[in-house]
Amino acid sequence: VSGSYSRGALLGLAAIAMAGIFRTRHRFVYLALLALLAIPALNFMPDSFHERMQSISNAGTDASFQGRVDAWQVAFYVARDHFPLGVGFYGPQLKEIFNAYLPGATSHAAHSIYFQVLGEHGFIGLAIYLVLIAAAFITSAQVRKLSRGIPELEWIFQMASMIQISLIAFCVGGAALSLAYYDVFILDVALLIPLLNLARAAAAAKKKVKRAIADRQIGENPIPA
């Protein structure tokens, strides 16, 4: 991640680190290990990496960031003028469309999954996209709840937990990257469906067994009249 020089990737990595703090039971150990890994890694990176990352705090004077702001403006204007479905895949960054709103400016990718979808598929497309993300978080929470504390479903619980962290990284890092259709995000969403079905089936079977045991105990020890 650090070797990619991507500010969006760094944001995603920071989101994963923060999520880990709230998930782990051994926070002090986790923080100590995080520091042991992060400090040498940052010292190992060249000056060009630090200069690029420092541009996050100097966004107002960074030409690359200004290009993103221009792209966000174009995405909004395109969604407004081509309501409700936008102009299609990669439309807003086409020179002819981009310069129609910002004459003379260099066309620029949105570098944000949210503005990318807004410009390409309009307000309705963005709404559907956000609902999909929200549904993925809700589903992962349901899977974790159904599988928590059940030894034979531990793998389902762990997978749902990691998918949830993956979604957090995608949503945070994606705010600075044009990766709206990233295949790992699609795979995360797709995997949650069978995981939920498996967790529901296992939970229902466990409940059925408990009910059968309770009924048998009542039959063996009838309540006196």
Language-model features and meaning:
Residues G3, R7, H26, F49, ...:
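Juxtamembrane transmembrane-helix termini
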Residues A17, H121-S166, D188-L192, N197:
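Hydrophobic transmembrane alpha-helices and their immediate junctions
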Residues S4, M18, N43-M45, A136-V143, ...:
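Hydrophobic membrane-targeting alpha-helices
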Residues S4-G8, H108-S112, A176-I186:
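Membrane-interface catalytic loops of GT-C/OST-like multi-pass glycosylation enzymes that act
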Residues Q142-F157, A204-P224:
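Membrane-interfacial, low-structure loops and terminal tails that flank and connect transmembrane helices
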Residues A35-L36, A135, I165-G219:
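Transmembrane alpha-helices of multi-pass inner-membrane enzymes
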Residues V1-M45:
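Hydrophobic alpha-helical segments of polytopic membrane proteins
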